[in-house]
Amino acid sequence: MAVYDFRMYTLKPGATPEYMAAVREVGKPVRDKYDVKLAGWYYSDVGELNQVVHIWAYRDHAHWEEAKAKVAQDPDWREKYLPRVRGLIVAQKTYVMLSPDFAPQPF
């Protein structure tokens, strides 16, 4: 059963374009190496601003654990991605979620 890593971030005012560039250029390509699927990526337009949500899909809990460990050790993640985004994030919420069998599955 697919597992979803649902992440909500509050960014510093005006930091959304810079954060999106870091994800596009480094963050997503690193996750791609470990077969992590981008299931959704959104940013606020109306209402509470400076919010981004990304949803990453994994085949199962074992894939989530394995990929999470590999991403954390990846040199591009540690040396290129984290330094770019650390100063942009004000708050973070993360949920690991499951999807029922009637919902679309990424794998």
State what each model feature region is:
Residues M1-M20, V26, V30-K33, K37, ...:
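Surface-exposed interaction/gating patches
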Residues Y4-F6, L49-V53:
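Short, solvent-exposed beta-strand edge segments and adjacent coil->beta transition regions
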Residues T10, I55-A57:
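Short hydrophobic/aromatic beta-strand micro-patches
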Residues P17-A39, E48, A57-V96:
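An amphipathic, aromatic/His-enriched active-site/gating alpha helix that lines ligand/cofactor pockets
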Residues Y42-S44:
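Short, solvent-exposed loop/turn elements at beta->coil junctions and helix N-caps
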Residues H54, L88-I89, L98-P106:
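A general structural signal for short secondary-structure boundary/capping elements
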